[in-house]
């Protein structure tokens, strides 16, 4: 598989992480590079590790995994999205402070946005792709796009203030529904 093809695949796989990064950037009262790097590196790491997992383990259980992977992503994104909407309606501001962004929360988002990368890893095994090169390209692409996503979300959040967390929650739920539809209709 050519490097060009790998970069295109990486860009496509990064779109969920980018959208969630925009959603989280919307909730930031003040832009913070520490938070931005934390989320970008988390998403990049998950996007790089999931193809490795898919390549080495997932290919043995591909029928089993494909039956429920989309439900996991859907549930994680919806739970987090509903919580964000609840926070926006009750005027709680737990997501405004980057230090409140827990490892558990980041892990849930990282898993939810990288389920497709797990499936791609299974495909890479069948195509005999160099998995280390593919994982590196996917991780780097996701990290860069997530950095831009948080920054873009914060920029937009500065302009719409009050509805930012509500919009962020809606984006996460929409991403969950998208994952479910893709796997149920096109899977």
UniProtKB/Swiss-Prot annotation:
Bridged cysteine pairs (disulfide): none
Gene Ontology CC terms: plasma membrane
A Pfam family reported for this protein in Swiss-Prot or TrEMBL: Mntp
InterPro entries per UniProt: Mntp/YtaF, Put_MntP
Gene Ontology molecular function: any one: manganese ion transmembrane transporter activity
Its membrane topology: Multi-pass membrane protein
Subcellular location: Cell inner membrane
Function: Probably functions as a manganese efflux pump.
Family in the record: Belongs to the MntP (TC 9.B.29) family.
Name recorded for this polypeptide: Putative manganese efflux pump MntP
Organism: Actinobacillus succinogenes (strain ATCC 55618 / DSM 22257 / CCUG 43843 / 130Z)
């Amino acid at each position: 598989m050519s490097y060009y093809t790998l970069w295109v695949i990486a860009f496509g796989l990064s779109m969920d992480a980018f959208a969630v990064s925009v959603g989280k950037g919307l909730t930031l009262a003040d832009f913070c590079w520490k938070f931005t790097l934390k989320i970008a590196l988390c998403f990049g790491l998950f996007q790089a590790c999931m193809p490795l997992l898919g390549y080495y383990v997932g290919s043995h259980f591909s029928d089993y995994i494909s039956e429920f992977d989309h439900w996991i992503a859907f549930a994680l994104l919806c739970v987090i999205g509903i919580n964000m909407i609840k926070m926006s309606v009750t005027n709680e501001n737990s997501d405004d402070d980057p230090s409140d962004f827990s490892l558990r929360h980041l892990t849930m988002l990282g898993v939810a946005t990288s389920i497709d990368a797990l499936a791609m890893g299974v495909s890479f095994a069948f195509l005999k792709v160099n998995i280390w090169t593919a994982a590196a390209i996917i991780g780097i692409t996701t990290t860069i796009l997530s950095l831009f996503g948080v920054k873009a979300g914060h920029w937009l959040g500065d302009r719409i203030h009050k509805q930012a967390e509500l919009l962020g929650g809606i984006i996460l739920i929409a991403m969950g529904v998208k994952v479910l539809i893709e796997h149920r209709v096109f899977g």
